[in-house]
């Protein structure tokens, strides 16, 4: 089942709800109405300074814990 979840990747657009640089994580509100978790380890170096309202494109990864954002770029 774990392998099935990781194979389901969907590219989408959203807006940063919040990102805490000290805690190294935050959330994105997807245009599809689904929030996605984002962690510093999944961000390119130049995007670690995300701020609320930044529009981003990312790939949603469906995990047992919920949706995780990967391959994020600011648009």
Set out the residue ranges of the language-model regions.
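Short boundary/loop segments of OB/S1/cold-shock single-stranded nucleic-acid-binding domains
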Residues: 1-12
């Amino acid at each position: 089942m774990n392998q099935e979840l990781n194979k389901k990747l969907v590219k989408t657009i959203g807006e940063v709800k919040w990102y805490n640089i000290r805690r190294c994580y935050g959330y994105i509100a997807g245009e599809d109405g689904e929030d996605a978790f984002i962690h510093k380890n999944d961000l390119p170096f130049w995007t670690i300074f995300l701020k609320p309202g930044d529009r981003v494109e990312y790939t949603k990864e469906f995990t047992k814990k919920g949706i995780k954002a990967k391959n994020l770029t600011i648009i």
